[in-house]
């Protein structure tokens, strides 16, 4: 049987007023019990977005483009004092990047915070974040990819619902913009994610009892395991979820709906990271359901020496006997739907849709 490889979607690869700096407050390192959930206030046109780089730096051109994108959404933009600082592949030292986050949460004139990009380095700054202060100054925090480490930290340590969504360097096309607004600005009681409006995306097809890679139709997601489940949405980038496993910032997946995306990792690496989350009884084996995004550019270069991505996903996840879908449009793809981290939702894998059960912002 002929197997097609995944066809990679393209990922999207001004001035502002500085504000007074605050010294970063180092975490006491205590493993906090799960804090009571806090849902931040919605964003509105005219609000001020704080733009920062908690991982890899932005170039001046990327910064200008990011500011323009946010202004086109109707926001005012203020970027962090350390925005254009570089330290190798990082956007400044760990303490500088943490300081930017702490002071943006503390600044009452900042209504929401968006990351300029991902890259690498978010996990390094977790010990320097003041989670008590952040909890007392809740506001939307938005990002994905390497920013998964911060989504874990904010939700687990401060109880703050945050948002796996586009960043400054993202492509604000119709779908990305629509779901950003539906989640963060114009919340609905039961927002449905089902790819109905999506142009062709990557998917998986079932043929002769096995999974085969295909181009999906505009309405297609793939059911790996049918069924329905409810739970809080948590998740993010698989590499970061794996990195955080066993740390004080890790999250229990018991009865959660776990969403996962990845980019540029070979099938054996996907296998290894999923296996790590399977070997812990409080991780994927305890989950209520799994929502997989598009695993962009994750097929083997030489498929004769490798399992396909499809085979890995089927082998590792089908045996859990919980609902699993593949292909929801989020992650390292152009049409990147915003997912609220910590909001209750219902997964209907048989019908290939995800529905929020509460408003994602207050």
What are these regions (language model features)?
Residues 5-27:
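N-terminal export signals
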Residues 21-58:
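C-terminal segment of N-terminal export signals and the immediately downstream linker at the start
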Residues 82-138:
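N-terminal small/polar loop signature for handling phosphorylated ligands or for N-terminal nucleophile
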Residues 131-153, 161-168:
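Short, acidic/small-residue loops that bind anionic groups at enzyme active sites
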Residues 167-235:
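Conserved anion/nucleotide-ligand pocket segment
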Residues 233-271:
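Oxyanion-binding "anion nests"
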Residues 269-362:
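C-terminal active-site/capping subdomain that shapes the small-molecule cofactor and substrate pocket
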């Amino acid at each position: 049987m002929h197997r097609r490889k995944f066809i990679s979607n393209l990922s999207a690869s001004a001035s502002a007023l500085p504000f007074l700096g605050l010294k970063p407050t180092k975490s006491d390192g205590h493993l906090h019990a799960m804090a009571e959930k806090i849902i931040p206030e919605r964003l509105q046109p005219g609000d001020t977005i704080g733009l920062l780089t908690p991982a890899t730096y932005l170039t001046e051109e990327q910064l200008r483009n990011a500011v323009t994108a946010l202004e086109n959404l109707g926001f005012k933009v203020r970027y962090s004092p350390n925005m254009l600082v570089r330290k190798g592949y990082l956007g400044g030292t760990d303490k500088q990047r943490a300081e930017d986050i702490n002071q943006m949460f503390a600044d009452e004139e900042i209504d929401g915070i968006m990351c300029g990009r991902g890259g690498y380095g978010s996990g390094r700054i977790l010990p320097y974040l003041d989670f008590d202060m952040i909890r007392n100054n809740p506001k939307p925090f938005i990002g994905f990819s390497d920013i998964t480490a911060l989504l874990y930290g904010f939700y687990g340590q401060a109880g703050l619902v945050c948002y796996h969504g586009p960043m400054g360097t993202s492509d604000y096309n119709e779908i990305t913009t629509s779901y950003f607004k539906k989640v963060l600005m114009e919340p609905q009681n039961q927002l449905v994610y089902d790819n109905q409006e999506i142009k062709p995306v990557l998917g998986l097809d079932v043929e002769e009892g096995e999974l085969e890679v295909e181009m999906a139709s505009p309405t297609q997601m793939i059911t790996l395991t049918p069924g329905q489940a409810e739970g809080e949405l948590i998740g993010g980038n698989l590499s970061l979820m794996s990195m955080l496993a066993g740390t004080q910032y890790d999250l229990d997946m018991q009865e959660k709906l776990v969403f996962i995306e990845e980019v540029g990792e070979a099938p054996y690496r996907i296998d290894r990271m999923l296996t790590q989350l399977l070997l812990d009884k409080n991780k994927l084996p305890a989950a209520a359901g799994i929502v997989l995004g598009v695993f962009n550019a994750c097929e083997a270069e030489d498929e004769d020496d490798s399992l396909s991505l499809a085979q890995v996903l089927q082998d590792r996840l089908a045996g859990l006997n919980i609902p699993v879908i593949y292909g929801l449009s989020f992650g390292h793809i152009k049409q990147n739907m915003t997912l609220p981290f910590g909001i209750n939702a219902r997964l209907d894998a048989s019908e290939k849709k995800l529905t929020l059960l509460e408003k994602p912002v207050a």
